[in-house]
């Protein structure tokens, strides 16, 4: 009985997959882009529906975007997977209604309907634009289907397996990168390695291949790395101090406490 409640219904799962494919394939420069809060909600519902409650530790202070995402996911508590899928679909309906209300239909290209078509096929109560717009788009779609089948673009990111991904097959960071377009991909590129972190802390450093990490060719390509620069400055000041000690007459005429101490030791 418990497993039946936990497993989502087939219709709900199909609607969820269609909504995920639409969000992941929204054009970057299209007429509408979800807001920051909407992307966080989509991300949290997606993680809850595919992985369950948030059990991973919160990211560090150096990853503010990761902390926002973690807070949104963790705020869902013990919400079931089916409830998370339903919430994702409901949020998708609100977004569709917002697009219809705010974006002028004259600015929406006809091929834009290809991104939203999966929703109208599986979600009966999906908000729809005016009938005049639907008739124009439906006629375009029928011409494509009857003429050239290859012109019909299938959803590129539609999940092939309805089962949620297992934690053993992907690490949490890999999962975040896979579904990043559900939330914050366009706002903050993910730092996948310490090398990228060093480049973000030190602007202007050129990226180096792993095998040339130590040499790096910084003298020819650009500014030196942080470590090499500090060591070079240290050597410069050390040599300057040596020259100053050799050429300074005051140093020779006025021996310091160390010279007096060595002289007294020799006399004793």
Curated annotation (Swiss-Prot):
CDD domains: ACBP. GO terms for biological process: fatty acid metabolic process. Residues 156-167 have a biased composition (Pro residues). It comes from the Eukaryota. Residues 151-175 are annotated as: Disordered. Residues 12-101 form the ACB domain. SUPFAM superfamilies: Acyl-CoA binding protein (SSF47027). GO terms for molecular function: fatty-acyl-CoA binding. Transmembrane segments: none annotated. GO terms for cellular component: cytoplasm. An acyl-CoA binds at residues 23-32, 43-47, 69, 88. PANTHER family: ACYL-COA-BINDING DOMAIN-CONTAINING PROTEIN 4, ACYL-COA-BINDING PROTEIN, ACBP. Binds medium- and long-chain acyl-CoA esters and may function as an intracellular carrier of acyl-CoA esters. This is Acyl-CoA-binding domain-containing protein 4. It comes from Homo sapiens.
